[in-house]
Amino acid sequence: IQSTSMDQGILTEDSMNSFIRTLIQAGIWKNKVPKQAARTKDGMQTTVKKTEAGADAMASKDTRLSFQPIVSVDAELLRQQRRFSSPRVLLSENTPLEPPPLYLTEEPTVLNRTSRRKREGKSHRGEYSVCDSESRWVTDKSSAVDIRGHQVTVLGEIRMGPS
């Protein structure tokens, strides 16, 4: 799975649910095989029924299967799901060229980011203090709202000096 912002369509809730159902049926959601696993034999698909005698053997098989890591995803499944898009996830047959940004936080140079930011000076990008005022143009010049939220009268002229 590779992260990118290149989208081909709009992802709807129904299409995402359909995709998750496909993943569950393929047995790759949460690295588990569904409880009533479909077994294939000679190209025919049959559903295995549990009996009391074979329940313990089947449970140990299912437990063993549920902990097996999924090594790869079928390329055909990826081709079918190309129409699903997300700003954060792209299903791709190719492995990513570099690790996702989350892995970069484990590097030692990034761990000391807080103290480095303090030395560099304050950055207010994307941050707002509780006391920030809201600036707006006064268009009618007769009334406005001050920083405390009170309605005030705006003077048209301010005379300075002796009048």
From Swiss-Prot:
Residues 4-119 form a propeptide. The keyword Ubl conjugation does not apply. One of its GO terms (cellular component) is axon. InterPro entries: Cystine-knot_cytokine, Nerve_growth_factor-like, Nerve_growth_factor-rel, Neurotrophin-3, NTF3_N. GO terms for molecular function: growth factor activity; nerve growth factor receptor binding. SUPFAM superfamilies: Cystine-knot cytokines (SSF57501). It comes from the Eukaryota. This is Neurotrophin-3. It comes from Eryx colubrinus colubrinus.
